[in-house]
UniProtKB/Swiss-Prot annotation:
Pathway: Purine metabolism; GMP biosynthesis; GMP from XMP (L-Gln route): step 1/1. InterPro entries: Class_I_gatase-like, GATASE, GMP_synth_C, GMP_synth_GATase, GMP_synthase, GMPS_ATP_PPase_dom, NAD/GMP_synthase, Rossmann-like_a/b/a_fold. It catalyses: XMP + L-glutamine + ATP + H2O = GMP + L-glutamate + AMP + diphosphate + 2 H(+). Residues 206-398 form the GMPS ATP-PPase domain. This is GMP synthase [glutamine-hydrolyzing]. Catalyzes the synthesis of GMP from XMP. Its EC number is 6.3.5.2.
Length: 523
């Protein structure tokens, strides 16, 4: 079996908003990597045994006395090191160079002129008309390196940054003041490939097929002939987890699908058809709509609704698990960003790996072992694996749907009537987005039920019914978002269909709020 962890890159995080993007780019190249906090110990680095190390950017200033520094062992480990932005600055400082606060800060696009050819910039050039090769890059820095460490050479400059890139080829140390991990840097992926593959010598074994083979083998080794229970929601993470487990242990996997009455139109039937009929998984469908809606009566505060939905799910799941007395393992669709977030929130350090209970926390008395086959993977990798396992692309690329479902898309108190109305309205919205070619042009779209009534006219009669809001946004990372400028004729068609086809809705509005100041979801 292919050892997909044999060659690996260690990324030390100094707090940049782009750090996870570095990891995703390295994985995209085909090499495994992990993201740890900057203050790891020598023992931890030795144990990980990286083939190369990348120092990320960060918001701090190396001119400050107590700013973060890379562990000294990083520069004594005998492996290549790439410093990006702050990572380059701390490399320079720690190896005897000097940094200063710049009079001319660089934020945004810049052109770096290459002054020397080294292994990092081999065959890179974005401007063939220039005397020296040039790269179109993305800068985001206020400090700059003003004096090189011994044995380093300047490899790149900009008009306001005399040392935009540097290298010591003998020790295989490299620094770039720009961000190769962002798509704005045109040859960024090629630069990272030069470092990871050509300089570090990593083999590109991190592929969907090899990841599946490795995951299946590890599941078999972990659980053996034991039985496993999984809460299957129909979302990407739990779906891919289910198929990996099914491939590894077959009928020893018991999937529990909880229909809470807060799902999209016909979603429960679609999940059963896909995983029960098509893939042959062992699925228990629990119709718990009444139980959820009863528990939610009188609750209108968003966080209280979320907590109630999470608690009822745990109770329902617990009831079903008690019926399966031979189950010894609980499977979860935890992915790598969950692991990073969980560790950081508990300790402030990304390298302390803790379990992330994405089902809201299970009772201690269940005493089940934990199986998390996706915990090393980013979301885009999970989708690629799902595709390789046979899941349809349209399912894997669906817009995000919140864990509480319609519980946070019905404003105020949740009632079955409201859920039914917003479900049907949203189905029309999605249908028209697909038909018009807009579904995959926007990052997320959904319908919100507004608990207000307004007067409308149908034929010769007046009606006094509910209102819904349509929401569509465009975003790269969901941290910020712009409202999508859908064509007026499309919005008009969607509105007319909803008002005419969904009895109980008399008004449709379109949300034109960006994030910030608004959030993407209303609750």
């Amino acid at each position: 079996m292919t050892n997909i962890h044999n060659h690996k890159i260690l990324i030390l995080d100094f707090g940049s908003q782009y750090t996870q993007l570095i990891a995703r780019r390295v994985r995209e190249i085909g090499v495994y990597c992990e993201l740890w906090a900057w203050d790891v110990t020598e023992e931890q680095i030795r144990e990980f045994n990286p083939t190369g190390i990348i120092l990320s950017g960060g918001p701090e200033s190396t001119t400050e006395e107590n700013s973060p520094r890379a562990p000294e062992y990083v520069f004594n480990a005998g492996v290549p090191v790439l410093g990006i932005c702050y990572g380059m600055q701390t490399m320079a400082m720690q190896l005897g160079g000097l940094t200063e606060t710049s009079d001319h800060r660089e934020f945004g696009y810049a052109s770096v002129e290459l002054k020397a050819t080294d292994s990092l910039f081999a065959k890179l050039n974005d401007d063939l008309t220039a005397c020296n090769p040039k790269l179109d890059v993305w800068m985001s820095h206020g400090d700059k390196v003003t004096r090189l460490p011994s044995n380093f050479q300047i490899t790149g400059v900009t008009p306001t940054c005399p040392i935009a890139a540097m290298s010591d080829e003998s020790r295989r140390f490299y620094g770039v003041q720009f961000h190769p991990e962002v798509t704005h840097t045109k040859s960024g992926l090629a630069l990272l490939t030069n470092f990871v593959v050509n300089i570090c010598g990593c083999e590109t074994k991190w592929t969907a097929e090899n990841i599946i083979e490795d995951a299946v083998a590890r599941i078999k080794a972990q659980v053996g002939d034991d039985e496993v229970i999984l809460g299957l929601s129909g979302g990407v993470d739990s779906s891919v987890t289910a198929l990996l487990l099914h491939r590894a242990i077959g009928k020893n996997l018991h999937c529990v699908f909880v229909d809470n009455g807060l799902l999209r139109l016909n979603e429960g039937d679609q999940v059963m058809e896909m995983f029960g009929d098509k893939f042959g998984l062992n699925i228990i469908r629990v119709n718990a709509e009444d139980r959820f809606l009863d528990a939610l009566k009188g609750i209108d505060e968003p966080e209280a609704k979320r907590k109630t939905i999470g608690k009822v799910f745990v109770d329902v799941f617990d009831d079903e698990s008690k019926k399966l007395t031979s189950v010894k393992w609980l499977a979860q669709g935890t992915i790598y960003p969950d692991v990073i977030e969980s560790a950081a929130s508990k300790t402030g350090k990304a390298h302390v790996i803790k379990s992330h209970h994405n089902v809201g926390g299970l009772p201690d008395y269940m005493k089940l072992g934990l199986v998390e086959p996706l915990r090393e993977l980013f979301k885009d990798e999970v989708r690629k694996i799902g595709l390789a396992l046979g899941l349809p692309a349209e399912m894997l690329n669906r817009h995000p749907f919140p864990g509480p479902g319609l519980g946070v898309r019905v404003l105020g108190e949740i009632k079955k009537e409201y859920c039914d109305l917003v479900r049907r309205a949203d189905a029309i919205f999605m249908e028209e987005l697909h038909a018009s070619g807009w579904y995959y042009k926007v990052s997320q779209a959904f319908t919100v039920f507004l608990p207000v009534k307004s007067v409308g006219v149908m034929g010769d009669g007046r009606k006094y019914d509910w209102a819904v809001s349509l929401r569509a946004v465009e975003t790269i990372d969901f941290m910020t978002a712009h409202w999508a400028h859908l064509p007026y004729d499309l919005l008009g068609k969607i509105s007319n269909r909803i008002i005419n086809e969904v009895n109980g809705i008399s008004r449709v509005v379109y949300d034109v709020s960006g994030k910030p100041p608004a959030t993407i979801e209303w609750e």
